[in-house]
C-alpha cells in the first residue's frame, strides 16, 4: 500500500480497508463474529499477547480485520517526514513533544495535514524551554477549510465497513482521554451489525520499566525506517493507570446492564499480564 501524500489520498474507503484487512473481506467474515477490543498502554505488547490468546482459542491473528489508528498514521508521508526531522532536534527530556505532531495529524481536516506549522511551533517550543522543559500547548491557528474526513473519522468508517460485513475484528486502542470509549464510540457501531458479535475486551498490562524498554526498542526500529511515533516515557505511569481505570469502568457497565440487543453474557473481560505472561480471567 502506497503512502498517503495528502489527506485526499486517504479518503478512499478501499484504501482504508486494504490497510485493515490482511486478506479479502470474504475470508474474514463469520456468522458468529468476534470483536476483540484490545487496550493497554503503548509498548505493553498488545499485538503479541492478542496473537497468543487468539491462537489458544483456535483463531489466528491474521484472520481478523485490524482496526488501528496507528496503522493509518504510518501511511502519512508528511507525518513520517516531519517527525523524523523534529526527532533529530529533541532530547530524551522533550521527546514527548512529538505527540503534538501525532495529534495534529489524526485530527487534521486540511488536505496537506498542516504539519509544517506544527513542526515549527514545536521546534520553537524546544528552543524556548532550553531543551529540557515542556511548555504549555499552543493553540491551533490552522483553519479547517476542507470537507475532508480526518484520520480518526476514516478509522471509524473503516471500522463500520468491517462491522457491516460481519468480519472478525480486532480494535486496537489506548484508553487514555476517553475512558468510556467502548460504550460511547465502539458499541454504537457494533450495534449496526446485521449479525450479533461476541465482544472480548482484553487489557494487556506490564511493569513500567518493561514498557519503557520496549518503547525504546520500538523507537530504534522506527528510526531505521526514517520515522518515529513517540510516547514520552514519563507519561507511561499515567497511561497504565488510565487504561486500567477505563477497563474497570467498561467491565462494571457492560457486566451489569442489559442494553437490549447486547446483554452481559455477550461480553468477556480479560487481563493479560505481559510481565509474567500469565493470563488472568476476571
Segments predicted by a language model, with ranges:
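N-terminal pre-Walker A segment at the start of P-loop NTPase domains
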Residues: 2-27
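Glycine-rich phosphate-binding loop used to anchor ATP phosphates in small-molecule kinases
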Residues: 143-194
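Conserved substrate/cofactor phosphate-moiety recognition/catalytic segment
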Residues: 54-165
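The conserved Walker
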Residues: 41-42
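Conserved phosphate-donor/acceptor-positioning beta-strand/loop module used by diverse small-molecule
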Residues: 193-215
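Conserved glycine(s) of the Walker
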Residues: 45
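Conserved GTP-binding G-domain of TRAFAC-class P-loop NTPases and closely related GTPase folds
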Residues: 209-282
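Hydrophobic positions on the alpha1 helix immediately C-terminal to the Walker A/P-loop
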Residues: 49
Amino acid at each position: 500500500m502506497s503512502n498517503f501524500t495528502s489527506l485526499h489520498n486517504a479518503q478512499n474507503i478501499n484504501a482504508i480497508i486494504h490497510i485493515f484487512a490482511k486478506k479479502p473481506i470474504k475470508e474474514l467474515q463469520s456468522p458468529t463474529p468476534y470483536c476483540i477490543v484490545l487496550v493497554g498502554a503503548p509498548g505493553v505488547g498488545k499485538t503479541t499477547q492478542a496473537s497468543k490468546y487468539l491462537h489458544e482459542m483456535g483463531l489466528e491473528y491474521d484472520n481478523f480485520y485490524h482496526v488501528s489508528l496507528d496503522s493509518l498514521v504510518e501511511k502519512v508521508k508528511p507525518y513520517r517526514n516531519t517527525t523524523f526531522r523534529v526527532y533529530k532536534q529533541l532530547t530524551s527530556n522533550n521527546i514527548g513533544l512529538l505527540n503534538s505532531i501525532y495529534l495534529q495529524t489524526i485530527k487534521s481536516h486540511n488536505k496537506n495535514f498542516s504539519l509544517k506549522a506544527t513542526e515549527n511551533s514545536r521546534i520553537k517550543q524546544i528552543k524556548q524551554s532550553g531543551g529540557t522543559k515542556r511548555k504549555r500547548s499552543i493553540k491551533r491557528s490552522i483553519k479547517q477549510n476542507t470537507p475532508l474526513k480526518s484520520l480518526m473519522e476514516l478509522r471509524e468508517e473503516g471500522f463500520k465497513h468491517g462491522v457491516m460485513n460481519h468480519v472478525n475484528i480486532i480494535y486496537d486502542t489506548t484508553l487514555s482521554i476517553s475512558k468510556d470509549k467502548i460504550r460511547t464510540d465502539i458499541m454504537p457501531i457494533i450495534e449496526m451489525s446485521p449479525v450479533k458479535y461476541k465482544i472480548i475486551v482484553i487489557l494487556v498490562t506490564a511493569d513500567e520499566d518493561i514498557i519503557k524498554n520496549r518503547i525504546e526498542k520500538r523507537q530504534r526500529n522506527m528510526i531505521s525506517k526514517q520515522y518515529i511515533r513517540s510516547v514520552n516515557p514519563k507519561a507511561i505511569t499515567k497511561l497504565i493507570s488510565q487504561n486500567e481505570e477505563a477497563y474497570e469502568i467498561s467491565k462494571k457497565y457492560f457486566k451489569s446492564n442489559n442494553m437490549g440487543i447486547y446483554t452481559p453474557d455477550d461480553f468477556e473481560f480479560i487481563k493479560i499480564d505481559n510481565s509474567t505472561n500469565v493470563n488472568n480471567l476476571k
